[in-house]
Amino acid sequence: MLLDVNGHATYCYTGGKPFNGAQPTVVFIHGVLNDHSVWILQTRYLAHHGWNVLAVDLPGHGRSAGDAPESVEAAASVIAALLDAAGLARAALVGHSWGSLIALQVTSAQPGRVSHLAMVGTAFPMKVSPALLDMSLHQPFKAIDLVNQFSHSMLAPPPSAMGPGTWLYGTSRALMRRVLASNPAVNVFHRGFQACDSYTQGLTAMAHVRCPVLFVLGQDDQMTPPKAAQALVSAATHGRVLTVKAGHQLMLEAPDEVALGLAAFLVK
């Protein structure tokens, strides 16, 4: 599904179902050097259980045109414009990693417009080491391999999740390289990391959130370990935590737990 957002064609995956204005909607927001496909299992489940899903490719990523956001705040304004373009007065937001901060910022800016907020693999502050920031700029393929190593806690997904023989490291590395190549004008890897590293408004934003908040955390996450989310958890007025046995790419490593956890959260 393509939407005109701020004058640019913006791609949203709908989970294999046509958009139905009579149903509630969940917007999924990916992290750095990812695209809509990281949500493939969760979006398909929700789309076939009574929800509209819009899994966006952020501007300058994957199939979406436009300039890649330079900050969490800039990306949040894109998501707000996406809601306008889709004609949505109200929606649930689900974000992973950088996407979780984007979803938080949108919810803070427009609290009456967000029914539920799910922050998956999150942390605040979401600092990136200076060495990794520099590597993402000057040696992006080396940085991809390093990040990929620390983003997974298993070589293959659990049985029945993605089919026998699926290699999580290879799948994620190929995606990251593809997203990097999708925008020859801008290093979206470095730009996304800078956006995470420079974001300072997390606790201020959470203070303005009035809707239910779900934190989905991977117990073996080395990129955003659960302890790094505790400041946000403590600041959430209506928050609860779901911890799953997975690393940072928990949507792929614990797909059923994440999908069912989101589904249970969204009906409340």
Model region roles, listed by residue range:
Residues 246-260:
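Catalytic histidine-centered segment of alpha/beta-hydrolase-like enzymes
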Residues 101-147:
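Flexible "cap/lid" loop of the alpha/beta hydrolase fold
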Residues 31-34, 97:
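Active-site glycine-rich loops that stabilize anionic/oxyanionic intermediates
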Residues 22-31:
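Short beta-strand element of the alpha/beta-hydrolase
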Residues 209, 215-217, 221:
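Short beta-strand/loop motif that positions the catalytic acidic residue
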Residues 226-249:
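Catalytic histidine neighborhood in serine/cysteine hydrolases
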Residues 134-208:
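Conserved alpha/beta-hydrolase catalytic His-Asp/Glu region
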Residues 2-15, 40-48, 52-98, 260, ...:
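Active-site loop/oxyanion-hole signature of alpha/beta-hydrolase fold enzymes
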